[in-house]
């Protein structure tokens, strides 16, 4: 039974990933049905950036740290339900992303699906989506009334701290 003494701090909480399904058909069909490109889906599945969970076959979008350890995960129902959220222990500074080195810019999205949709559009335009920094903010960012009181989203702060070459930030926010 949790007490004040044995509750771990946010930073100490381990990421609790759901059980991984041995198959990916449900997630693949869901993403393909949302218009995401076949090659992009396969890349994400092969790299375990996306997994299919059991028992509900949700799509789970995973973010990793520099040591390739999962530190963030968001789940989304693959049926008509609007069930979605972050897995327990998720650290938003490691949110879902497709990254390239030394591009000088980063593209920010509210969620993983928006990011994957943009990568698909880039491919349709003949651009190599692997050559861009595409990062999910892991939810909608809402600045304070006084902009000076606002904080930089943690995932962006961490990225800017780690990659000093970034000079341009492109926002892809739709507030849906």
Regions found by a protein language model. Give the residues of each.
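Basic, glycine-enriched DNA-binding surface that flanks or lies within the catalytic cores of DNA
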Residues: 1-92, 97
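Generic alpha-helical structural element
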Residues: 16-20, 107, 175
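Residue-level recognition of short, well-ordered coil/turn positions
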Residues: 31, 164-165
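Conserved beta-strand termini and adjacent loop/short-helix elements that scaffold enzyme active sites
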Residues: 44, 137, 172-174
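Phosphate-handling DNA/RNA-contact segment within nucleic-acid enzymes
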Residues: 54-162
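Acidic beta-strand-to-loop metal/phosphate-binding motif
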Residues: 108, 167-176
């Amino acid at each position: 039974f949790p007490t004040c003494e044995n509750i771990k701090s946010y930073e100490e909480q381990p990421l609790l990933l759901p059980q991984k399904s041995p198959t990916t058909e449900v997630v693949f069909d869901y993403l393909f049905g949302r218009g995401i490109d076949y090659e992009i889906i396969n890349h994400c599945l092969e790299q375990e950036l996306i997994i299919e969970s059991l028992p509900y076959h949700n799509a789970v979008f995973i973010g990793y740290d520099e040591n390739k350890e999962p530190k963030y995960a968001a789940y989304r129902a693959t049926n008509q339900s609007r069930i979605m959220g972050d897995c327990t222990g998720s650290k938003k500074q490691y949110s879902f992303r497709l990254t390239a080195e030394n591009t000088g810019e980063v593209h920010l999205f509210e969620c993983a699906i928006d990011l994957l949709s943009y990568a698909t559009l880039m491919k349709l335009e003949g651009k190599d989506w692997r050559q861009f920094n595409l990062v999910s903010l892991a939810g909608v960012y809402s600045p304070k009334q006084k902009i000076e009181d606002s904080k930089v989203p943690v995932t962006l702060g961490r990225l800017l701290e780690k990659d000093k070459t970034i000079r341009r930030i492109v926002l892809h926010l739709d507030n849906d």
